């Protein structure tokens, strides 16, 4: 069995809907991944084992997904020097500001790259992981470049189609 390049670690199965666009992006880019459900607080030994063994398994990037206290990405980063991306899950507190701050406020020396809360966060985490992989994988880099070009063409097409032009004095 091929080792996954990316491992998603979710604090709860309720986080799954927030990463679907990200999973689709990795599939489109043909990047191998696995999804694990582990809690920094309820299964700390399993999180520790996953983090410590990720590199030897061939994993290149870890993505931690959590809401509320959202310690999972930081706990992953504390046990590995692999890149860790944190995805904050929206909560009732200011749309996930608590989650975002829990992930982004890491002490010096234990970095966690952090993306937006919500659906765009899951997709952007996948694309950031792909960008990291693309440094050493020309196929992934080319696919990302093509995706950006397609995105730009769609926006320019809508601009031309809608023809919205506002001029002022």
Segments (PLM) and residue ranges:
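Short, ordered loop/turn segments at secondary-structure junctions
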Residues: 13, 38-40, 67-68, 89-92, ...
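N-terminal beta-loop-helix "entrance" segment that forms/cooperates
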Residues: 35-56
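Glycine-rich phosphate/diphosphate-binding loop of Rossmann-like nucleotide-binding domains
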Residues: 3-42
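C-terminal binding/interaction regions
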Residues: 4, 10-17, 21, 97-169
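Acidic, glycine/proline-rich low-complexity segments that act as flexible tails and inter-domain linkers
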Residues: 4, 17, 35, 44-45, ...
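Glycine-rich phosphate-binding loop
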Residues: 50-88, 92
